[in-house]
Every structure is written in C-alpha cells, then in structure tokens.
Amino acid sequence: MSKGKYVAYVSSYTQGDSHGIRIYDVDMKNGRFKEKDKVEITNSSYLTISHNGKFLYSITDFGVEAYTIMPDGDLELINFAPINGMRGCYVSTDYTDQYLFVAGYHDGKLTVLRLKEDGSIEEIT
C-alpha cells in the first residue's frame, strides 16, 4: 500500500451472503469509505493484522484463515488451520509474529498456533 492510502477490513457474519470480509478504500480527506472488494469466508467473527503489517488472520466457524495483504490492500488466501472445534472470539499475534493466539468464546480456553515467516498457520502448539 502506498504511503498516505488507507484500507479498512470489516469482518461480519454471513447469512445468505458468503462474503464475510469486506475491503474498503478509506478517503481520509472526505471521511468516506468505498467498498473495493469482498472475500468469501464463513462468519468472519474477528480479525487481526500481524505486527509487521503483512498478514491478516480471521476466525471462522471452522478455525482460522491466513491472508497475505497485497500492496493494493487486497487479500490473498494463504491457508486455513482448524482449532479443534473451538469457537474463537478473539485472535492476535505475538509481537514477533511467531505465534497466533485464539481465545474461545464458550469455553474460555486459549489456543496457540505457530506461524511461519510466510504468514501461514501451522498446527496447534
């Protein structure tokens, strides 16, 4: 993304529409959002961006999906990782982007997954 340009990522539940992430160009001068793309994902209940700004991670009904953030702000799917049936409600990376933390909504548990340098999610640690 070029300096001075902003992109917003909005996650949502999907009922009748399979696009759970919407990507918006942000016009800071006029305070407007313009939808530029949408991503097919089921019930993207929460998302986070890695500390290095290169990757986006989203919780789904079935686990966590990893995306590369392209120079124009679009997203490219890297991979998916299951979280053993846990229904995640929060996702975050550590400061070095080596681990992904997923907090459980119903059970209050925390699942930790290892991350590779390319942003892909490995198995639960």
Task: Give, region by region, the residue ranges found by the protein language model.
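Beta-rich catalytic cores
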Residues: 17, 43, 87
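Short loop/turn segments immediately following beta-strands, especially the blade-tip
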Residues: 24-31, 67-74, 112-124
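Residue-level detector of Asp-centered blade-edge/turn motifs that repeat once per structural unit
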Residues: 2-4, 49-53, 95-97
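An edge-strand/N-cap motif at the start of beta-rich repeat modules
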Residues: 1-16, 23-25
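A short beta-strand motif characteristic of beta-propeller blades
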Residues: 34-40, 76-82, 125
